[in-house]
Amino acid sequence: MSSGGLLLLLGLLTLWAELTPVSSKDRPEICKLPKEPGPCRSYLLYFYYNSVEHKCQTFHYGGCEGNENRFHTIEECKSTCAA
């Protein structure tokens, strides 16, 4: 393979690595949990990590029970799950 072909291959691999989301196996387990508003009815605005769409999103938390995939701020969600 010529040096130009190797450079092209290296460039494509670098681009692929930059655009590929962090593998779900590298995320904490709480980030893999579904959003869970819980049975209460407080209607509090929280954030959760959507592992299908690979991003933090808002949801309304009822104020009790639920699971650990809930964050007060989008920054907290991103620093935990979207790194």
Swiss-Prot record:
Drop me one GO molecular function for this one.
serine-type endopeptidase inhibitor activity
The protein's location, in the record's own words, is: Secreted
TM region(s), chain numbering = none
Which Pfam family, an example, fits this chain?
Answer: Kunitz_BPTI
Gene3D superfamilies found in the cross-reference section:
Pancreatic trypsin inhibitor Kunitz domain
Function, please?
Serine protease inhibitor.
Task: Indicate what this protein is called per its UniProt record.
Answer: Kunitz-type serine protease inhibitor vestiginin-7
Q: Which organism is it from?
A: Demansia vestigiata (Lesser black whip snake)
